[in-house]
Regions:
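Catalytic loop of the DD-peptidase/beta-lactamase superfamily, centered on the K-T-G motif
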Residues: 1-138
């Protein structure tokens, strides 16, 4: 390696099955199949807002209603305000999205291998999330 490149998600690969296990573990408060993977206290800390109110949120994945915890984006669940409660997850550069909603007791995983939409335009994957919420909560 001539010059190392630091990239938080660069080179991470997973199967859909393992992604489901991961999201299920997070939905269950850090436990999977009876084994404690991450403490509830750590998961709770990761889901607290860590970005100050003075930061412009226009460029966030989910607009001004979005926020950031430690390793997750945070988004108020439908019907909530910016103080929560929140769902949490991540949107990868290649199009993969996962959202865990402990309030409504479900997770959503959207697997794609695209980099931007047509001609490089950013994809609006929030449309998929909105459709899932509308189908489940109506």
């Amino acid at each position: 390696v001539v010059q190392p490149m630091l990239s938080g998600g660069g080179g991470l690969h997973s199967t859909t099955e393992d992604y489901v296990r991961f999201a299920n573990m997070l939905l269950n408060g850090g436990e999977y199949n009876g084994a404690r993977i991450i403490s509830q206290a750590t998961l709770d800390r990761m889901n607290q807002k860590f970005i100050g109110d003075d930061v412009n949120r226009d460029a966030f994945f989910f607009g001004p209603r979005g926020d950031w915890g430690l390793g997750f984006h945070l988004q108020p669940v439908p019907g909530a305000d910016n103080d929560g409660p929140f769902n949490f997850g991540w949107q990868g550069v290649g199009g993969t999205v996962f959202i865990v909603d402990p309030v409504n007791d479900f997770f959503m995983i959207y697997m794609a291998q695209v980099r931007g939409g047509p001609r490089g335009a950013p994809m609006d994957l929030t449309l998929s999330q909105r459709a899932v919420y509308e189908a489940m909560l109506d």
